[in-house]
Every structure is written in structure tokens, then in C-alpha cells.
Amino acid sequence: MPPAAAGGQASPVAAGGQAGGAAGGQANTEYVLTLSCPDRVGIVHAVAAYLHQAGCNVLDSQQFGDRTAGQFFMRVHVESLRPTATTYRDLYSGFVPVAAEFGMQWELHDTAVQPRVLIMVSRAGHCLNDLLYRRAAEALRIDVPLVVGNHPDLAALAAAHGVAFEHVPIDRRDLLSAPRAEGRLLDLVSELSIDLVVLARYMRILSPELCAKLPGRIINIHHSFLPSFKGARPYHQAHAHGVKLIGATAHYVTADLDEGPIIEQEVARVDHTRSPEDLAAIGRDAERIALARAVRWHAEHRVLLHGRRTVIFR
């Protein structure tokens, strides 16, 4: 979860998963610290001094001071030079007074712990296939225990990647169907210890109540570079209007439909020679590329939320 979405300090379990290192009893040596706070002199010095005192070597550090908002953002990737003596909990508890001094919203993540991701789909499989392929190729370090679909169409695709599939139908004629489906989703998030929900062309609108329960933990992909063309067949509408750019946006889901903080956007230039089918194919590529980047950056703790905006440390 991005730091600003956490509402304060994350607990050791919530921020890094398994306190003390990787599974199997082996002490992990690498951690990612993310933080945001009101900007002032001395933040970088205080963070660096603490990490040095804790026996950590900085592998990568990025920071950004937003002069307009007066906010400071930082991501530090470190390795512990004494992993058997300094555990995750040690690093976490030792940083608490530093964070308190500067009023930080922060998280500490164990890089050995892969985020657990639940993917939700409808009938289009291009984004799901791309995410599961990248996962299998280890280009995307996430753990996907389950795919959920409001239609059963993609069960075979999930099975081909060795991932379980659950059909959670929604009947538009039944007013209680959608609330039941969202209740099941929340149960799965809890039962499977899900860190992130990805809407990989899931064609249902989530309720404001559900969005409020998972702030900063749901990523959606849609053709938002076609904002003038609402509803069905947006690429056919775009073709009729002669658009020159099409694309897709990956964003966090909020109660405001398709208006959550943007993580990534992918665009492609097109011209009059492209058919509606061409535009749809190009759009599908843009969707899978933007979504994969957004999920990877979230999984690598590169996204920091600040209101309706995001800071991305690539």
C-alpha cells in the first residue's frame, strides 16, 4: 500500500508481511523504506544517519520535494550488513522515533515478501494473460493465489497458468447480487491475505463502500485516453471522430468513477488508415502495458500517494 494511503505508520505485518526476513528461516538482507512528510531541512540526513547506525548499506535512493505542496517524498532500497543481528522488527522499531520527529507517513518492506494479488476479470483476457505471463517469467514479482471472474470465460486461461479461478456471478436482475459479490470479494481478501486487487478489464463498477474499505489497494485499467467516448464500443466512437491518439490509464480505484490517482498512462499515435478493429487491437496493447507497469511499480513500492496525485520513483 502506498504510504499516504496508510494514514500513518504501517505495522510490521501490514508493511512488510513476514517480520524478520524471508521464508524458510533465511534472514533477508534487503528492505525498501518509503516515506512522505512536510518538507524541511534535515530529512535526508536523519534517514541516512539512522540507516548507517542500523548497519544498512544504501543500494538506491530517490527523493522529491514538492515545492507547491510543501511535501517531501523518499524511497530508499537498502541491504543490511548484519542480517543475523538486525531483523525487520529491529529496523522498524528503530525508525519509529525518526518518523515521529518529522511527522512521516511511512512503510518498511521486506523485499523477499512478494505482494499477494487477487486479479478480477470479466471476458477480455489480454490483461490477465499478460500479468500471469510476466509473473511466470519472473518479470513481475507477485504472488497470485486466485483469479475471480463475474463470467466463467477465463477459467481455462487461469488454469493454464496454474492459478485457481472462482466464478462470482452478478445478475443485473437481482438487486442483491452485486452486494453479495462484493461481500465475497472482501471475504477472499481477508482469507487469502490479499495485498492488492487488480481489475484486469473487470467490467463492473465497485461500490463506494468497497472502495473505502480498500484504499490504495485496488488498481484499474481503462481506455481513459478516450474520455469523450463513454459506454460501449469506445474505439468505434473514436474512429468515427477521427482521433489521432488512443491509449490507456492505470489508476487506483476510488469512489469517484475512473477518477482515482493515476499511476501510468500509455498512448499510441493513429491516423485515418486505422479501422475500428485496428484501434481496438492497439488499445488492448496499451492497456496491458500500462497495467503491467502499474502493478510492478506498486509491487516494488515505487508509488507514493499524495491526495489525488502519485509520486512514482521508477
Roles of regions detected by a PLM:
Residues 1-3, 56-57, 61-62, 91-93:
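Short N-terminal helix-initiation segments at or just after the protein's N-terminus
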Residues 40-60:
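Short amphipathic alpha-helix segments
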Residues 11, 20, 28, 64-65, ...:
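Compositionally biased, intrinsically disordered low-complexity segments enriched
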Residues 65-71, 75-314:
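One-carbon transfer enzymes
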Residues 27-38:
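Short glycine-/aliphatic-rich beta-strand segments at the starts of folded cytosolic domains
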Residues 27, 53, 68-70:
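Solvent-exposed loop and beta-edge segments used for protein-protein assembly and interaction
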